[in-house]
From Swiss-Prot:
Pfam families documented for this protein: LpxC
Keyword Metal-binding: yes
Coiled coil (residue ranges): none
GO BP of this protein: lipid A biosynthetic process
Lipid metabolism listed as a keyword: yes
Descriptive protein name: UDP-3-O-acyl-N-acetylglucosamine deacetylase
Active site location: 261
Source species of the chain: Oleidesulfovibrio alaskensis (strain ATCC BAA-1058 / DSM 17464 / G20) (Desulfovibrio alaskensis)
Enzyme Commission number(s) of this protein: 3.5.1.108
Lineage: Bacteria, Pseudomonadati, Thermodesulfobacteriota, Desulfovibrionia, Desulfovibrionales
Chemical reaction(s) catalysed: a UDP-3-O-[(3R)-3-hydroxyacyl]-N-acetyl-alpha-D-glucosamine + H2O = a UDP-3-O-[(3R)-3-hydroxyacyl]-alpha-D-glucosamine + acetate
Family in the record: Belongs to the LpxC family.
Gene: lpxC
Cofactors: Zn(2+)
GO molecular function, one term: metal ion binding
Amino acid sequence: MNQTTIKKTIGCSGIGLHSGKVVRLTLRPAPEDTGIVFHIRTEDGVHRLTPRPDDVIATGLATTLGLNGSSVATVEHLLAAIRGMQIDNIQIDIEGNEIPIMDGSAASFVFLLKDAGIARQNKPRQVYRIKKPVTYERDGKWIKAAPHDGLRIEYTIEFDHPAIGRQSMDIEVTPEAFAGIIAKARTFGFLREVEYLHSNGLALGGSLDNAIVLDEYNVLNEDGLRFDDEFVRHKILDFIGDMALLGAPLQGHFQVHCSGHALNNGFLRTISEHEELYLKRVELSETAQREHAVEAAPAGTPVAA
């Protein structure tokens, strides 16, 4: 399996979650072995950032990357789309300091990538594969990883809320599975948190148009949920995006319990800092390519945990 990039430059604009201002995003083809690279345009010039786990400077409302005084926030949905669609090399130009939130999912980014087209390059794809079982745990939340030829995610969430409760999903992530099952799941938050954030000048771009918002009992969005288990699907989306910072796609079997951006990044830093123990660099030849079956419940049906 060879490396890939997009066939043409494509862009969009949208509201920034934090600033509430319009942000311009442009995606460009990139040469082999480039990986994912950000060009962040600010008032003092253009800053180039090839993200790694230790470039994460904040994990509060979203994952924020920073280097040499420049930063870009809410990167996880775009990164999930890039990894989910198996694009290896791409340049991301951003005018401002955050990725547009769009509708709160990765669907718009998948649409952009498909519209740009995917070009197969000449060099073989390089991936990181989990070498041996590893567990990362904090405060009853954990990530367990084991060797696997592909990307399989078993994810469970538990919320003391009648509209969420306990949800689980087990999925083998392929481009088809990502686009059809994961990409459309939106981010979610609680009304009490939104009101607090707005009162403190935060999340000014957040609304019912780009997030699922819940009060103490119900979903407030007029159109309801896209899937009965949209919450766990979005957590898988976030996980894929947060795992995209190694410099190459990550393969393994991941069992995840109630994780979030901070735990995801802590896990990624651990396996990155101890690469010789936990990671194996693998070159995927064309003859080794195989299709992974989608191991997931039918749309809208949680898997019993």
